[in-house]
């Protein structure tokens, strides 16, 4: 019951862009779910990469929307912030790839998961920011 109330509260307070994006991506994630749960290593990795690519499209979209709204003096600051985030994501992926404790295949899964989770989190962060601007 408490979880339901928290979810309802989050939905009420979420902004219009975030709501639309969340609904769009829910459909996309459901599309890839069978492959992610298939048990086939190649199928799972391929689905993960494709899903991350879809989140990347959303990231680029919301990034550009924010950029259009920002005053000129804030644009360079925002671009630098995004570049720092991209570098941190690359470093996290590289670290995950280097972690072969459970073997190289698991390192690939770890890297794919890291890229997906970080990209999704950044999209949600920027969507909230964009909604606050409107």
Predicted regions and their residues:
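N-terminal signal peptide c-region/cleavage motif recognized by signal peptidases
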Residues: 9-11
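N-terminal alpha-helical modules
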Residues: 14-134
């Amino acid at each position: 019951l408490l979880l339901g109330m928290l979810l309802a509260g989050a939905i009420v307070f979420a902004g219009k862009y975030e709501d639309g994006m969340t609904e769009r991506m829910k459909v996309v994630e459901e599309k890839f779910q069978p492959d992610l749960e298939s048990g086939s290593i190649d199928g799972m990795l391929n689905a993960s990469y494709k899903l991350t690519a879809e989140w990347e499209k959303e990231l680029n979209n919301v990034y550009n929307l924010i950029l259009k709204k920002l005053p000129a003096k804030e644009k360079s600051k925002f671009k630098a912030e995004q570049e720092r985030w991209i570098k941190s994501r690359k470093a996290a992926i590289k670290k995950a790839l280097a972690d072969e404790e459970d073997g190289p295949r698991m390192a690939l899964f770890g890297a794919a998961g890291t890229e997906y989770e970080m990209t999704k989190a950044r999209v949600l962060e920027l969507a909230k920011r964009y909604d606050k601007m409107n």
